[in-house]
Amino acid sequence: GVKFFLWTSQWGRFTNTGPIKGKGDLFYFVHTTLWAFLPWSFAGFFALFKKTKEIIKRKSTGETYSYFGFITLFLIFSFSKFQLSFYLNPLFPLLAIITTATLLDARIKTLKIFSVIHMVVCCFLAVGLLALNYFFLNTLPYIDTIIIILAGFTAGFYLFSKRGIYLKKILFATAMVCLSVNYYVNRDFYPALMHYQAESEVAYYMKTNNIPADKIVFVGPIQSVADIILHHVTTVVDNDTVEKADVSDKYVFTSPEGRNKLDSLGMKYSIIKTFEDFPVTRLTGKFINRKTRSAEVEPKYLMKVNPADFRIPVVDVTTR
């Protein structure tokens, strides 16, 4: 109840005494910030370094609330034993304020250096986008995506080609390129990627084909996201503890291990559909490469299990 939300779940994550445990890495949020705040992460780290140096030497001007707010929470998160990348989300506005203030007061030489850095980063983003589309999809993006990318990259690199206007290059040109890349990622890449999250795919399949949510049983170590899609708390049974009564005359979603368990119980079933599954939050190069992807995905099955025969066998003890 209240204690769990205000104490166990929060302080327990920091001390690693709660229900959710982790190992903790002191530098986890350092390298997470490097990619999560990209392409302004280099300017962000420079701004933090410069502000820290000014405060130590007591030469700081302007407000310091953003700086100390960021540093305090960043250190708390870094010392926590349980860490997730999205913990940084509330810190990004503070880091953006610090970074912008530093760039506005920076010398021309500094701005010139960062404008070059951002142009290089944008070039890498462009190459990365092309590589991602080629290896993962190998199809043309949607027409609206193509228009957005062409417009964003053209405007961005046009600004980069202009002499001077270093601050506009760092802020606006970079933003145009990044918005274009993010449009592609959310319009084309993520929708295709989510087809490999079998738990959500089976839920959409059930809704489309009018399969009752209360008739599905998830067998195996599955952290089902289907509950949200189906608006129903689904039943999850472990492979080692599943019994005939759990799956008799039910729809079952399971892995090859769960299928083998049903075979050992003597259950009869028909496979309705096979899904390809992969932990989509932990991407690998072999999975992204469509030529090696088949070896990385695991099949998951939606099956209709026949009613089990619970009759006790009659033993003929008649002596002849």
Predicted regions and their residues:
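Membrane-lumen/periplasm interface segments of specific transmembrane helices
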Residues: 1-4, 79
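Membrane-embedded architecture of ER/inner-membrane glycosylation machinery
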Residues: 50-320
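Residue-level signature of the transmembrane alpha-helical core
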Residues: 10, 33-34, 71
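Juxtamembrane membrane-water interface segments that cap and precede transmembrane helices
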Residues: 6-29
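Terminal, non-globular segments
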Residues: 45-49
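Membrane-interface anchor segments at the N-terminal boundary of transmembrane helices
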Residues: 21-42, 85, 137-143
